[in-house]
Swiss-Prot record:
Gene3D superfamilies: Ribosomal protein L17. The gene is rplQ. One of its GO terms (molecular function) is structural constituent of ribosome. It comes from Prochlorococcus marinus (strain MIT 9211). Belongs to the bacterial ribosomal protein bL17 family. Pfam families: Ribosomal_L17. This is Large ribosomal subunit protein bL17. The keyword Ribosomal protein applies. SUPFAM superfamilies: Prokaryotic ribosomal protein L17. One of its GO terms (biological process) is translation. PANTHER family: LARGE RIBOSOMAL SUBUNIT PROTEIN BL17M (PTHR14413:SF16), RIBOSOMAL PROTEIN L17 (PTHR14413).
């Protein structure tokens, strides 16, 4: 039973939802910003902040957990090198969500999620 579990379902089965969030997280870390729907941006925020927190931790175990989640291994190493300098003084709040115009085809609420 799912009593009071607040996981955004995104209208997909669990395996597809996990794959989408992994891909979006990888893209966000690589590019610095991603344009997607508002619901996906809110779900992506949790995953991206978790990866940045792991990178700030900097341990071997944290690096291995990040490699298991992010698709690009080189990107993980870059993230771990830069995270402490970039986010060392922050305790969370590594991303920003900005709402944009609705998507033309289906009028879905769109948003830009970017790294601060």
């Amino acid at each position: 039973m799912r009593h009071q579990l607040r996981v955004p379902k995104l209208g997909r089965p669990a395996d597809q939802r996990k794959a989408i969030l992994r891909g979006l997280t990888t893209q966000l870390i690589r590019e610095g910003r991603v344009t997607t729907t508002k619901a996906k941006a809110k779900a992506l925020r949790n995953e991206a902040e978790r990866m940045i927190t792991l990178a700030k931790e900097g341990t071997l175990a944290a690096r291995r957990r990040a490699i298991g989640y992010i698709y690009d291994k080189k990107l993980v190493h870059q993230l771990f090198e830069k995270a402490q300098d970039r986010y060392g003084d922050r305790e969370g709040g590594y991303t920003r969500i900005v709402r944009t115009v609705p998507r033309r085809g289906d009028n879905a609420e769109m948003a830009i999620i970017e790294l601060v």
